[in-house]
């Protein structure tokens, strides 16, 4: 039996194409069936399956957590142990075992550092992405700026030998400068694009393993 394709209503050509892809996306359907808040949950599931980053008892900081797909995955892995601090300026419905902190990670750094003061983080994860500008290079540079912000928190709050997962968009020379700057900070750097990432997407995840100091 052939899978049914959902039809979309009348709208602009670009939004119609996006909506068509979205409603017929197998990961969107799977997320709905398995009660994940977003298809992005499967990206983290793939990342963790490959790299075994999050373990029971770990303390995890998630930056840019709304709507909560990644938070659900991490909370399931921790299973009532450790601690998950999920930070986003956008509203996010509560999840059992998750500390939801509403603030701007760029403009309210002092407040976040006060919140995590004295906390030894095992892992920092981020699925942050910039608003699309229409320029491949601009979007890539903006994504790297967000990743640099994630690394700012890692430098100050991630324990030695800790791990960072952060996303960038490929398409600018800044990527190579940024990644090269990390080689003195982490023992190993891996690039990973999950199957759950759309083929046309330029997103790639940097898996930064073994903070050196």
From Swiss-Prot:
GO cellular component term, pick one = cytoplasm
Q: Where is the active site?
A: 167 (proton acceptor)
Q: What is this protein called?
A: Ribosomal RNA large subunit methyltransferase E
Q: What is its EC number?
A: 2.1.1.166
Q: What class of enzyme is it?
A: transferase
Location in the cell reads: Cytoplasm
Cross-referenced Gene3D superfamilies? Vaccinia Virus protein VP39 (3.40.50.150)
What does the UniProt function comment say about this protein? Specifically methylates the uridine in position 2552 of 23S rRNA at the 2'-O position of the ribose in the fully assembled 50S ribosomal subunit.
Residues the record lists as binding S-adenosyl-L-methionine: 68, 70, 88, 104, 127
Which taxonomic lineage does the organism of this UniProt entry have? Answer: Bacteria, Pseudomonadati, Pseudomonadota, Alphaproteobacteria, Rickettsiales
Family (UniProt): Belongs to the class I-like SAM-binding methyltransferase superfamily. RNA methyltransferase RlmE family.
């Amino acid at each position: 039996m052939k899978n049914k394709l959902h039809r979309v209503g009348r709208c602009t050509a670009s939004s119609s194409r996006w909506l068509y892809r979205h409603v017929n996306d197998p990961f969107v359907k799977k997320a709905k069936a398995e009660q994940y808040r977003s298809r992005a949950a499967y990206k983290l599931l793939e990342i963790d399956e490959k790299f075994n980053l999050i373990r029971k008892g770990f303390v995890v900081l998630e930056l840019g957590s709304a709507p909560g797909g990644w938070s659900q995955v991490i909370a399931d892995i921790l299973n009532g142990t450790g601690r998950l601090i999920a930070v986003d300026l956008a509203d996010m419905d509560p999840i059992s075992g998750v500390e939801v902190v509403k603030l701007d990670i760029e403009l309210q750094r002092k407040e976040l550092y006060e919140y995590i003061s004295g906390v030894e983080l095992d892992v920092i994860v981020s699925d942050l992405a910039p608003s699309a500008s229409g320029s491949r290079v601009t979007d890539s540079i903006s994504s790297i700026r967000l990743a640099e912000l994630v690394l700012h928190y890692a430098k100050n709050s991630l324990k030695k030998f800790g791990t960072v997962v952060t996303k960038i968009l490929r398409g600018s020379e800044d990527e190579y400068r940024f990644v090269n700057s990390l080689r003195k900070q982490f023992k190993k750097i891996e690039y990973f694009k999950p199957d759950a990432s759309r083929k046309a997407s330029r997103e790639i995840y940097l898996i930064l393993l073994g903070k050196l100091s």
